């Protein structure tokens, strides 16, 4: 895993960006690709300064109120709504369309997707959610490779029953079942779908953590992982560090990953990263 202490909030897992590109002037490179001016950087950062307090309130609720799983999921979903809005994504009509994995089974196998973003008839991107990854009393929650949407009660793995998501989406269990239930396996399955149904990117929101998965890099074990705790901490140091908000935004906003009728900016950034890696 190639990380950079200057951008501690980003984990460049499996060299999503070549380590020679993900260095101390990474922000300048991304800003140049995005064509964003200094004044525009300031405008991008402003909503995140306000979001910090909302994030702290949300995190305090999770840690101090010890909510039921279903209430924690709902509060996490609501925080995600605020974050997605700042990132430029439409946030209404969540979970209106399932990702159907196998419609020849009974019940039909599906994966819950918060938002499906298309251009024409082509799926471009999924926005998905999982439970938060906030540590409570030094107890690590189930992560990307353990957490499940639903599970066999006899399994030794941590249980994430679909009923616990009932405040976010309702699942007709006679018609549908969540399969694959383990989240990283669900991601793999999505990236093996037929091309017209396969997203280029998946933005996975997990409360204090954001993941970006790419169909061209997932099989190689490469993805980006963002810590909101580290983002807010680093960006609050001084005015210079506040630009970390803009870097986060430029990497995962809708304009970068799913702009309408334009070349995907992230593809441009990745292309530049290989040209200038060494």
Language-model segments: which ranges?
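Active-site metal-binding core of divalent-cation-utilizing nuclease and nuclease-like domains
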Residues: 82-123
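Histidine (H) residue identity feature
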Residues: 75-80, 93, 98, 115, ...
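Short, basic/polar, glycine-containing "phosphate-handling" surface segments that engage DNA
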Residues: 1-70, 122-278
């Amino acid at each position: 895993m190639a990380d950079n202490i200057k951008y501690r909030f980003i984990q460049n897992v499996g060299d999503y960006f070549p380590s020679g590109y993900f260095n101390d002037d990474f922000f300048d490179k991304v800003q140049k690709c995005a064509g964003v001016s200094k004044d525009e950087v300031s405008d991008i950062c402003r909503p995140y300064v306000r979001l910090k307090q909302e994030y702290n309130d949300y995190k305090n609720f999770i840690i101090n109120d010890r909510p039921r799983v279903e209430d924690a999921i709902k509060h996490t979903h609501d925080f995600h709504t605020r974050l997605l809005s700042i990132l430029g994504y439409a946030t209404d009509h969540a979970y209106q369309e399932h990702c159907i994995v196998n419609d020849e089974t009974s019940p039909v196998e599906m994966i819950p997707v918060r938002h499906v973003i298309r251009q024409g008839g082509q799926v471009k991107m999924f926005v998905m959610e999982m439970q938060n990854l906030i540590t409570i009393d030094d107890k690590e929650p189930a992560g990307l490779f353990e957490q499940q949407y639903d599970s066999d009660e006899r399994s030794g793995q941590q249980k994430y029953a679909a009923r616990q998501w009932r405040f976010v989406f309702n699942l007709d269990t006679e018609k549908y079942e969540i399969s694959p239930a383990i989240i990283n396996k669900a991601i793999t399955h999505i990236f093996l779908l037929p091309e017209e149904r396969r997203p280029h990117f998946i933005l996975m929101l997990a409360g204090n953590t954001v993941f970006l998965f790419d169909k061209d890099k997932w099989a190689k074990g490469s993805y980006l992982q963002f810590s909101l705790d580290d983002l807010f901490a680093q960006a609050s140091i001084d005015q210079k560090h506040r630009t970390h908000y803009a870097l986060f935004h430029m990497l995962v906003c809708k304009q970068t990953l799913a702009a309408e009728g334009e070349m995907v900016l992230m593809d441009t950034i990745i292309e530049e990263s290989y040209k200038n890696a060494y």
